[in-house]
Amino acid sequence: MEAVLTKLDQEEKRALQDFHRCAWEETKNIINDFLEIPEERCTYKFNPYTKKMELLFTPEFHTAWQEVPECREFILNFLRLISGHRVVLKGPIIVFTKEVKNLGIPSTINVDFQANIENMDDLQKGNLIGKMNIKES
């Protein structure tokens, strides 16, 4: 009986991870559509080992989401909708809080938008240089 319960927990966790992957894929698409940029400016990476999701973006997105009120509000509202979390904007950091812990979902998720330029070659090549880290606690 104990093994069955453990298996169900693993399946639930896997389903939760799949949900987050789908939700962030949709977020990425909506951000690209909203900014009306023909080429892709956002991509995401989910690391199952660290359980962290990264949304990578170009400098244009890094500037737009904070400086264009409509873009900022749209992203915040969409994140509220897909995450089921209360979302608070604190400067460049979005803080998610969830009232009830469930299926290992942390009570607080900090989403930190930051420009992260590794070297000038990446910048000149137009590579993705920023990332949004979801830090679970």
Swiss-Prot record:
Signals that turn on the gene: Expressed in the late phase of the viral replicative cycle.
Cellular component, GO, one term: virion component
Principal subcellular localization: virion
Cellular localization per UniProt: Virion; Host cytoplasm
Keywords recorded for this protein, A-Z: Host cytoplasm, Late protein, Virion
Function, as annotated: Plays a role in the inhibition of the host innate immune response. Mechanistically, promotes the autophagy-mediated lysosomal degradation of host TBK1 and affects IRF3 nuclear translocation to block type I IFN production.
Subunit (UniProt): Interacts with host TBK1.
Family: Belongs to the asfivirus A137R family.
Protein name (Swiss-Prot/TrEMBL): Structural protein A137R
Species for this entry: African swine fever virus (isolate Warthog/Namibia/Wart80/1980)
